[in-house]
A protein has these predicted regions:
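Core dinuclear metal-dependent hydrolase active-site scaffold
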Residues: 1-33, 37, 45-48, 99-122
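N-terminal start-of-chain detector that recognizes signal peptides
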Residues: 10-12, 39, 89-93
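Conserved strand-to-helix beginnings and helix N-cap segments that scaffold or border functional pockets
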Residues: 26-29, 50-53, 78-82
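Proline-aspartate-enriched helix->loop->beta-strand connector
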Residues: 34-40, 44, 50-71
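Binuclear metal-ion centers of metallo-dependent hydrolases, dominated by the metallo-beta-lactamase
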Residues: 65-122
């Protein structure tokens, strides 16, 4: 069981896919069709991995910002069984490493086409 959260603030619709561990159902895909920003797990093991995440993102063309999450960082122990964000990033186009753990967004500041934004861990 997984919970998907959707938020809308000041005209920007955000979707957080939680600990998604399987492909979206047709019903979920339809419900999530309109979004501006999507947070996607990419680390595998506990969630979908890089390939599944990339395929999922390709099915969400209206998401203008994709933010990968639930991946290995240098702050996790080496024995933690999830992958880094690199395999996902190599599979995607328009990847930006933000260099911060925070971004400020508005409807007018969203990119015109889909971009992947890799944030630093907090």
């Amino acid at each position: 069981m997984n919970t998907i959260f959707t938020f809308e603030m000041e005209g920007v619709r955000l979707v957080h896919l939680g600990d998604l561990g399987q492909p979206l159902t047709a019903e979920q895909s339809t419900a999530l069709h309109e979004m501006d920003i999507v947070f996607v797990p990419v680390g595998g093991f506990f969630t979908i991995g890089a390939e599944e995440a990339a395929t999922l993102v390709e099915s969400l063309p209206k998401a203008r910002v994709v933010i990968p999450m639930h991946f290995k960082t240098d702050r996790l122990p080496a024995v933690f069984p999830i992958a880094s964000v690199d395999k996902f990033a190599k599979r995607m186009e328009n990847v930006r490493r933000i260099g911060s753990s925070e971004v400020t967004l508005s409807r007018t500041s969203l990119p015109n086409s889909q971009e992947v934004w890799i944030l630093e861990h907090a």
